């Protein structure tokens, strides 16, 4: 085993384009499952309520209202769906 072989082992194949292609192929399954779950009816309705709240709060200059409850409802609905689907896609 020569010095060149050791360098290839430490840095990979040595071809930066090849390394970039390998990195681009990796997709986080959590992101994919979240996107799928956000399309479900329950999540769509929760997101609509969140967006309506955001519009209402943003249109007022002085308000004590925030959209914490709507945000938590949306995240809960999405994460409930994700919890049931994510572990099936993991190896």
UniProtKB/Swiss-Prot annotation:
Span list, region Disordered: 1-30
Species this protein is from: Bos taurus
Protein name listed in UniProt: Cytochrome b-c1 complex subunit 6, mitochondrial
Function: Component of the ubiquinol-cytochrome c oxidoreductase, a multisubunit transmembrane complex that is part of the mitochondrial electron transport chain which drives oxidative phosphorylation.
Quaternary structure and partners: Component of the ubiquinol-cytochrome c oxidoreductase (cytochrome b-c1 complex, complex III, CIII), a multisubunit enzyme composed of 11 subunits. The complex is composed of 3 respiratory subunits cytochrome b, cytochrome c1 and Rieske protein UQCRFS1, 2 core protein subunits UQCRC1/QCR1 and UQCRC2/QCR2, and 6 low-molecular weight protein subunits UQCRH/QCR6, UQCRB/QCR7, UQCRQ/QCR8, UQCR10/QCR9, UQCR11/QCR10 and subunit 9, the cleavage product of Rieske protein UQCRFS1.
Cellular component, GO annotation: mitochondrial inner membrane; respiratory chain complex III
Gene3D superfamilies in the cross-refs: Ubiquinol-cytochrome C reductase hinge domain (1.10.287.20)
The keyword Mitochondrion is assigned to this record: yes
Membrane topology annotation: Peripheral membrane protein
Localization per Swiss-Prot or TrEMBL: Mitochondrion inner membrane
GO biological process: mitochondrial electron transport, ubiquinol to cytochrome c
InterPro entries assigned: Cyt_b-c1_6, Ubol_cytC_Rdtase_hinge_dom, Ubol_cytC_Rdtase_hinge_dom_sf
Keywords for the protein's UniProt record, in alphabetical order: Acetylation, Disulfide bond, Electron transport, Membrane, Mitochondrion, Mitochondrion inner membrane, Respiratory chain, Transit peptide, Transport
Bilayer-spanning residue ranges: none
Protein family: Belongs to the UQCRH/QCR6 family.
Species classification: Eukaryota, Metazoa, Chordata, Craniata, Vertebrata
């Amino acid at each position: 085993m020569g010095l060149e072989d050791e360098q290839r082992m430490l840095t990979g194949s040595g071809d930066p384009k090849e390394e970039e292609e390998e990195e681009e192929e990796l997709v986080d399954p959590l992101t994919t499952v979240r996107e799928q779950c956000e399309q479900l009816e329950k999540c769509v309705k929760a997101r609509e309520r969140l967006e309506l709240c955001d519009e209402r709060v943003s249109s007022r200059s002085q308000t004590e209202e925030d959209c914490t409850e709507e945000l938590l409802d949306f995240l809960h609905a999405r994460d409930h769906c994700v919890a049931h689907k994510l572990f099936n896609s993991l190896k």
